[in-house]
């Protein structure tokens, strides 16, 4: 009983916090619309904050970035770029398949085959992976092409070879 008498009574009315201490989520007057950016960048265009930048719900309808125009690229530069692009894609599975394929097939490719391989590398990583392991049907532009058939055969790995990322330079460059 003495413990209850020692506790102070909390019988006063709780008042709301002053506006300066309220959280942003309770302050509806700051935002003009529910889609407005609550944290705009300092020098950003205010029109961009109100733009509708929604993507379609189906990921296959998303716009792909346009590949860079590489007209006038010589064969040596193209070959070096293809070696780099097959190694540094960002998806380990695709990197292993493409880099070992490039190690085995790129030295024997002519310029037109390398340009076609370059166009294949412009496709999304997971699409290339699923086409090469035959989990999805490739689109009409790639279906039945000799390049994709070679890639599918390489990905099948009939010899059950343990694949690792190949060395970047297999021989000293000619200077």
From Swiss-Prot:
Region (Disordered): 42-71
Biased composition regions of type Polar residues, renumbered to the chain: 51-60
Cellular component aspect of the GO annotation: mitochondrial matrix; mitochondrion
Keywords for the protein's UniProt record, in alphabetical order: Chaperone, Mitochondrion
Disulphide bond pairs: none
Function: Plays an essential role in the assembly of succinate dehydrogenase (SDH), an enzyme complex (also referred to as respiratory complex II) that is a component of both the tricarboxylic acid (TCA) cycle and the mitochondrial electron transport chain, and which couples the oxidation of succinate to fumarate with the reduction of ubiquinone (coenzyme Q) to ubiquinol. Required for flavinylation (covalent attachment of FAD) of the flavoprotein subunit of the SDH catalytic dimer.
Name under which the protein is recorded: Succinate dehydrogenase assembly factor 2, mitochondrial
Organism: Cryptococcus neoformans var. neoformans serotype D (strain JEC21 / ATCC MYA-565) (Filobasidiella neoformans)
Phylogenetic placement of the source organism: Eukaryota, Fungi, Dikarya, Basidiomycota, Agaricomycotina
């Amino acid at each position: 009983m003495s413990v209850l008498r020692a506790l102070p009574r909390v019988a006063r009315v709780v008042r709301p916090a002053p506006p300066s201490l309220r959280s942003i989520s309770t302050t509806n007057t700051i935002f003009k619309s529910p889609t407005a950016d609550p944290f705009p960048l300092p020098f950003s265009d205010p029109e961009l904050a109100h733009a509708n930048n929604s993507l379609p719900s189906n990921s296959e309808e998303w716009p792909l970035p346009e590949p860079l125009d590489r007209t006038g690229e010589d064969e040596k530069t193209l070959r070096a770029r293809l070696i780099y692009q097959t190694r540094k894609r960002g998806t380990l599975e695709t990197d292993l398949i493409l880099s070992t394929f490039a190690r085995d097939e790129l030295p024997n490719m002519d310029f037109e085959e390398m340009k076609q391989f370059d166009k294949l590398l412009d496709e999304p990583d997971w699409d290339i992976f699923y086409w090469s392991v035959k989990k999805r049907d490739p689109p009409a532009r790639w279906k039945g092409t000799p390049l994709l058939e070679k890639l599918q055969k390489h990905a099948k790995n009939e010899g059950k070879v343990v694949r690792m990322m190949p060395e970047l330079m297999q021989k000293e460059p000619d200077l």
